[in-house]
Amino acid sequence: MKIYKILNNNVVTILNNNDKESVVMGRGIAFQKKKGDEIDDTKVEKIFVLENNNVNDKFLKLINDIPVECIEVAEEIISYAEEKLETTLNENIYLTLTDHISFTANRYKNNMEMKNSLLWDIKRLHRQEFNIGLKALSIIKDKLDLNLPEDEAATIAMHILNGELNQDMPEIVNMIKVTEEILKIVKYHFNIEFDEESINYYRFLTHLKFFTQRLFNGNYYEDYDNELFDMMSIKYPESYECVKKIKKFIYDTYGNNLTKEEMLYLIVHISRVISSK
């Protein structure tokens, strides 16, 4: 690999076999190097191979407009998130999170603090992503010497959710709000307080994360087993009544009708979560 551009001692760009520019990172990778020099492969830590040409072009433009340190911070956060979540995030997050970190760094250096109105909801409903957000604050503190509040951990968690579910940020906000409303319906229907440390509660939240994704994508589970639905609605009549309230809420708010298959999964999860209250 030959250096095409040097951004700093740790970040360069190359041209691949298709003359497509890519970013390469590694400690000291460009030290005492110039354009056209060969890269020491042993120093390569990360090559940004972004398959989407539009995303790649925007990323290359972005890295020319922001401090390279913000790119390094974003990459470390994304790598940590993918390791913890055991998944590959949508590559668009390299754009959105890098840009957000640069914007946030400038804002806080100018004493412009912003609150996240969904902080409490994200802490409760998306703990794994929020904990990644907290780790991100530690990385930002170490690399950029900025002490950021938990509000920023929540915002970074939303970017992680965006990368997980491939949803736009307004949809992520709506997904969080819908999840909160569904939990309220269950809570007040059964007059209970959830055991938020129980495995059944965690599984319910995980189900709701992907249920709300399907809601906004319009990709519901299709009806395959009406007999099982009938059996479970009889076996768990109160959970069924609760799910009917959820169905009405979703129809009244978003105009979407839940399939019996979606209702079946909700009945099962609600029955489990109320058993561990």
Kindly give the residue locations of the regions a language model identified:
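A cross-family "folded-core" feature that marks the main globular domain of proteins
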Residues: M1-K277
